[in-house]
Amino acid sequence: MLAFNFFGATEGGLFDINATLPLMAIQVVALTYILNSLFFKPVGKVVEKREKFVSDNIIEAKNKLSEVEKLEADLLTQLQSARTEAQRIVSEAENESDKLYKEALELANNEANASKEKARLEIESQTSAARDQLSKQADDLSELIVNRLILEK
């Protein structure tokens, strides 16, 4: 008995080696098997499915995000080219408007100058005709005066 006291507990102490230990080991193994087959495997499958679902959704979201970023870049490029095109069209329209304005102004000036020249020529013609008529009348009048003076003598 002394040897047992030296190595550990005595009967009814902390640890008794009897049929309880193998029975407890069998219970632990059976409980582990039952829990593994009834709880851990189904829960593990559900967790794996959920992880796969989440990872697939993350991959899909990353793909969609990259597609959206690409589309955004394309739209920004298209918007910039549309703005450039609109500015070019506005500039061309302004240039065309200025050109038409200058042409209309030049045409109006030419017409005004032509009307002015026509009026000047008409005035000169009428002045010349009036001078000729006055000259003729003066000649007629002087001839008439000369004839009367001659007749009176």
Swiss-Prot record:
It is a single-pass membrane protein. The chain crosses the membrane at residues 23-40. The keyword ATP-binding does not apply. GO terms for molecular function: proton-transporting ATP synthase activity, rotational mechanism; proton-transporting ATPase activity, rotational mechanism. CDD domains: ATP-synt_Fo_b. Gene3D superfamilies: F1F0 ATP synthase subunit B, membrane domain. Belongs to the ATPase B chain family. F-type ATPases have 2 components, F(1) - the catalytic core - and F(0) - the membrane proton channel. F(1) has five subunits: alpha(3), beta(3), gamma(1), delta(1), epsilon(1). F(0) has four main subunits: a(1), b(1), b'(1) and c(10-14). The alpha and beta chains form an alternating ring which encloses part of the gamma chain. F(1) is attached to F(0) by a central stalk formed by the gamma and epsilon chains, while a peripheral stalk is formed by the delta, b and b' chains. F(1)F(0) ATP synthase produces ATP from ADP in the presence of a proton or sodium gradient. F-type ATPases consist of two structural domains, F(1) containing the extramembraneous catalytic core and F(0) containing the membrane proton channel, linked together by a central stalk and a peripheral stalk. During catalysis, ATP synthesis in the catalytic domain of F(1) is coupled via a rotary mechanism of the central stalk subunits to proton translocation. Component of the F(0) channel, it forms part of the peripheral stalk, linking F(1) to F(0). The b'-subunit is a diverged and duplicated form of b found in plants and photosynthetic bacteria. This is ATP synthase subunit b'.
